Amino acid sequence: MSTLASSGTPRDAKAWLVTPALAFIVALFVYPFAYGLVLSFEPMNGGGALANYTQFFTDAAMWPTVLVTLKLAVPATLINVGVAVPVAFALRRHSPYQKFATTLLVIPVTLGTVLVADGMLTYFGPNGWFPQALHGLRLYTDEVRLTHNYWGVLLSLIVSGFPFAFLLMLSYISGIDPTLARAAATLGANPWQQFRRIYLPLLVPGLTMAACLSFVQAFSVFPSAVLLGAPAGPTRVISIAAAEAAFENYDYSLASAIAIVMGFVQLLVVASMLGARRFFYSGPVTGGKG
């Protein structure tokens, strides 16, 4: 009996150690999601449990916000991940300039979305440095409009999202055993063949995760769409529709339904990317060293 009691004590201790983390997750993630899900089926104006979802998908001012958000999130994801791969590949080895270059590339993370948007208004605005430089160099004579439209929001998503994609790709590329490429080089593989035949297949899991996280971050765009876009026009994203329902119309039930739709679209895209990964790679999650 004493043996059973003593053997059960470590397991009970581990359970108690996990309890605070579980309580934290339930309080901050599970409960708000469950509450919002239930609230979405309780429309403020009645009409049945699915009234909010019916209103969203039949309102010409609401359902197009999904397409608008996708038109911003998908290109931003492709650009961020596509540029992050060669940059991370170039900085994969330790060198005197590697840390300096990495620090410069991740600076936007420390500034915050609002500060980045304010800086972009100063730099890319009609009277900003960038348009004035183009006009001064006679490279472009017409009016340059890179703010308060689609391009302003897209640029903001690229500037703020690239550091995350870069750091993810840098960690994956740095984790690939360099002796694999050196072995291929001894067999006559040039640098491009080394990248295409060795690094790229092993990077598929990292590419997928970076793309998923970049997409989720870009799809939830809100400050950039308001500050650098046209929130009543071409950059009225789904998060703006949810904010208007909650804070202008005080219809928290409809806002919850919009948030659920937003989460479902994100989940659908992420699941599609994770499923597509199996067609390109079926090995371990990383190509780690050793």
Model-inferred region functions:
Residues M1-T19, P96-Q98, A271-G290:
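Transmembrane alpha-helical segments of polytopic membrane transport and secretion proteins
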Residues T3-A13, L50-A61, A225-G275:
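Interhelical loop and adjacent transmembrane-helix boundary motif
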Residues A13-M44, A60-E143, H148-I173, L202, ...:
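Membrane-water interface segments at the C-terminal ends of transmembrane alpha-helices
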Residues E42, A51-T58, T102, Q132-L139, ...:
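Short amphipathic alpha-helical coupling elements at transmembrane boundaries
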Residues G46-A49, P126-N127, Y172-R182, P191-Q193, ...:
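Transmembrane helix boundary and interhelical loop/hinge segments in multi-pass membrane proteins
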Residues L187-G188, P201:
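Glycine/proline-centered hinge or cleavage motifs at structural transition points of membrane proteins
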Residues W192-Q194, A232-G233:
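Gly/Pro- and small hydrophobic-enriched strand-loop and loop-to-helix capping segments
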